């Protein structure tokens, strides 16, 4: 039974790591333009729902501390604000889901993962 519990714990840890890492996302970065529908600053990471021309997207930000260090807090934007997101979208093309490396709200550009931003 202990062996089974260890296997389950290991698999759950791997799934959490895969989700919070980058392995679930494309290598190429994509730009998404839209309007913020909602903002959640809850752990494990803040999430924006963004209404774009092709539907509602889930945009994952960094962990709460990292997101705040980038300059983004729950007061930085509101529903209805225009946003441009640079990030890596899900490998699953049918999902409107991406992880942001940079967001621009109005004139304010915030780099969540500056080391991951690819120069074109």
State the predicted function of each range.
Residues 1-4:
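Positively charged n-region of N-terminal signal peptides that target proteins for export
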Residues 13-15:
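N-terminal signal peptide c-region/cleavage motif recognized by signal peptidases
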Residues 22-39:
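Short, glycine/small-residue-enriched coil/turn segments at secondary-structure junctions
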Residues 42-51:
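Short aromatic-glycine-enriched beta-strand elements
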Residues 55-64:
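A short macromolecule-binding patch
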Residues 69-84:
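Short nucleic-acid-contacting surface segments enriched for D/E, G, S/T with interspersed K/R
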Residues 90-114:
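OB-fold/S1-family single-stranded nucleic acid-binding modules
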């Amino acid at each position: 039974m202990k062996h089974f519990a260890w296997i389950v714990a290991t698999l759950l840890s791997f799934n959490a790591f895969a989700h919070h890492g980058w392995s679930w996302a494309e290598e190429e970065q994509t730009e998404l333009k839209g309007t913020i529908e909602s903002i959640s600053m809850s752990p494990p990471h803040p999430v924006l729902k963004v209404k774009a021309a092709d539907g509602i997207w889930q945009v994952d930000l960094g962990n709460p501390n990292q997101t705040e260090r980038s300059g983004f807090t729950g007061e930085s934007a509101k529903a209805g604000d225009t946003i441009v997101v640079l990030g890596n979208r899900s490998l699953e093309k049918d999902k409107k889901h991406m992880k942001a490396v940079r967001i621009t709200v109005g004139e304010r550009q915030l780099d969540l993962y500056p080391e991951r931003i690819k120069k074109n």
